[in-house]
Structures are given as C-alpha cells and as structure tokens.
C-alpha cells in the first residue's frame, strides 16, 4: 500500500511566543476564569511526539483546537527553530483549518463581552449596552462613524495580562515591511 500524505497548515512561530500564549491561556483558564470550558492538553497527554500542547475551545456544537508543535524542520529564519501552530475547527467528524483572524473572531463571539455595532441600535432603542469590548483582537475591520463615536466616548479598558489572541500568536513581527524614511530625512541618500 502506498503512503498517504495529509497536508495541514502550520504557522511558524518562535518558542517564546508559544510560551507566552500557553501562559496566557492557563492564566485565563485558572485565575481570571474568562476562558471557562477551555481544555489544555499537555505534551505528555498526547501520543504524537511532535505535539507540544493543545488548547480545546468549545463553540456550542463545534470546537476550536489550537495545537502547538515542536521538533519540526527549521524555518526560513534561525529563530523559528522548528516551532509551529495549527488552528483547526471541528464539528462532529468534520474538520477544517482556519486562519488566525477567523479564530480570534470566533473566540470573541462566544467568550467575551463586546461593545459591538449592535450597541448603536440598542443605545438608540434605550436598551442597556455593554460599556466596552474585552477582546479587541476579535475586531478586524474599521467600524461605522457611530461605532467609532461610541468607542471614543467609552474607551476600552486594558486587561492585565491580555487575553490570548491567536492572531498575535502567529504574527510575523520579523518580516514586516520596513518603513522607509522620506527623502529629506534620509542622511545616506543626500550624502550628509
């Protein structure tokens, strides 16, 4: 019988970022209690030798599974050192990989109080609204003018430590495009 390959998306992440993610998840599971129902599986509870940890986040009938890996082939840069993260959405027997932005939005919808665009309509109708969003990572678009006005009126409260963001976990801060200086500010360009 021939070998059958299963391909999955694994985001290359440096080890310190994975450690920070694990610490934030454990903090919000056990101390702040904001991550109720989340399940953390340690590396020694997994039968797969490359799995470092798994975080299972229930979403009504589905669940989000964020798996961290170690011992993978080294990445393009020396700081990657074979660490990675995969994000999977599971419902029954159906499984699919999702991107970090969508994962953050799903976590945001199901777990954290939000001062969202529906707050505008609720405020106009005289209903009580949540004063702020506890999970800013779940918002990936610019809101309407009314939404921006309401958020300016009620500033979001920063939580210490921050809530675990999947997008922040896989963010590539090393390969962001460099900002170039303007012509007047560049000392090497004009020889001064």
UniProtKB/Swiss-Prot annotation:
Residues 164-192 are annotated as: Disordered. A motif (BC-box-like motif) lies at residues 144-153. The modification Phosphoserine is found at residues 144, 165. The record marks 150-151 as: Cleavage in virion (by viral protease). Processed in virion by the viral protease. Highly phosphorylated on serine and threonine residues. A motif (HCCH motif) lies at residues 108-139. Residues 54-72 are annotated as: Interaction with host APOBEC3F and APOBEC3G. Residues 151-180 are annotated as: SOCS box-like. The keyword Metal-binding applies. GO terms for molecular function: metal ion binding; RNA binding. InterPro entries: Vif. It is a peripheral membrane protein. The modification Phosphothreonine is found at residues 96, 188. GO terms for cellular component: host cell cytoplasm; host cell plasma membrane; membrane; virion component. Residues 75-114 are annotated as: RNA-binding. Residues 171-172 are annotated as: Membrane association. Residues 183-192 have a biased composition (Basic and acidic residues). One of its GO terms (biological process) is viral life cycle. Keywords: AIDS, Host cell membrane, Host cytoplasm, Host membrane, Host-virus interaction, Membrane, Metal-binding, Phosphoprotein, RNA-binding, Ubl conjugation, Ubl conjugation pathway, Virion, Zinc. It holds the Pfam family Vif. Homomultimer; in vitro and presumably in vivo. Interacts with viral RNA and Pr55Gag precursor; these interactions mediate Vif incorporation into the virion. Interacts with the viral reverse transcriptase. Forms cullin-5-RING E3 ubiquitin-protein ligase complex (ECS complex) by interacting with host CUL5, RBX2, elongin BC complex (ELOB and ELOC) and CBFB/CBF-beta. Within the ECS complex, Vif interacts directly with host CUL5, ELOC and APOBEC (APOBEC3F and APOBEC3G) substrates. Vif-defective viruses show catastrophic failure in reverse transcription due to APOBEC-induced mutations that initiate a DNA base repair pathway and compromise the structural integrity of the ssDNA. In the absence of Vif, the virion is morphologically abnormal. Belongs to the primate lentivirus group Vif protein family. Counteracts the innate antiviral activity of host APOBEC3F and APOBEC3G by promoting their ubiquitination and degradation. Acts as a substrate recognition component of an E3 ubiquitin-protein ligase complex: mechanistically, Vif hijacks a host cullin-5-RING E3 ubiquitin-protein ligase complex (ECS complex) and the transcription coactivator CBFB/CBF-beta to form an active E3 ubiquitin-protein ligase complex that targets APOBEC3G and APOBEC3F for polyubiquitination, leading to their degradation by the proteasome. The BC-like-box motif mediates the interaction with elongin BC complex. The HCCH motif (H-x(5)-C-x(18)-C-x(5)-H) mediates the interaction with CUL5. This is Virion infectivity factor.
